[in-house]
Design a protein with these regions (language model features):
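ER/Golgi luminal nucleotide-sugar-dependent glycosyltransferases, focusing on the catalytic module
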Residues: 1-169
Length: 169
């Protein structure tokens, strides 16, 4: 029988995450990262022992910690000793559109296929997407006591980076 490991990142709406976990069946295990910026207690109360929580990281968009928490989730799956046939990455805001049987059947029909989405940014013409890879995004991973100051500094640095000829190679 195939077994799925769901790796989930969340930062809000513990009741929704509990509904997501309840909607997916007992042929799956759940590994969850809760952003360190969020209060974990509602998630612990809502999920109990239905999930495995991994060490927490403070997450900001575009920050290196996004890679770190994904590594934590994958390490938990690999060290579980359970032979999963699939690892599925979800956010805490997702919800299944298919039945559990349809999900398992689809993966069984596509055993040799990995589903990883992406697009080529080499020829990207959308300015908002292009600047995400050509410009630096400083200050994302630094801990701040005041989110107001952090946001002001990020906006100022974004404007400065757009003016200066500093680009990633």
């Amino acid at each position: 029988m195939s077994r799925i490991a769901y790796i989930i990142s969340a930062y809000k709406d513990a009741p929704h995450l509990a509904r997501l976990v309840a909607a997916l069946d007992d042929r799956a295990d759940f590994y969850v990262h809760i952003d360190l910026n969020a209060d974990i207690h509602p998630f612990e109360e809502a999920l109990g022992d239905k999930v495995t929580f991994v060490p927490r990281h403070r997450i900001s968009w575009g920050g290196w910690e996004q890679v770190e928490y994904q590594k934590e989730l994958l390490a938990a799956v690999l060290h579980s000793g359970i032979p999963y046939t699939r690892v599925v990455c979800l956010s805490g805001q997702d919800y299944p559109l298919w039945s559990n049987n349809a999900i398992h059947r689809y993966f069984e029909e596509h055993q040799d296929t990995e589903f990883i989405g992406g697009f080529n940014l080499t020829h990207c013409t959308v300015k908002q997407q292009l600047h995400k890879i050509t410009h630096y995004h400083p200050f994302r991973d630094l801990p701040w006591k005041s989110i107001w100051w952090k946001n002001k500094l990020i906006v100022a640095s974004r404007k400065l980076v757009q003016i200066l000829p500093i680009r990633k190679a």
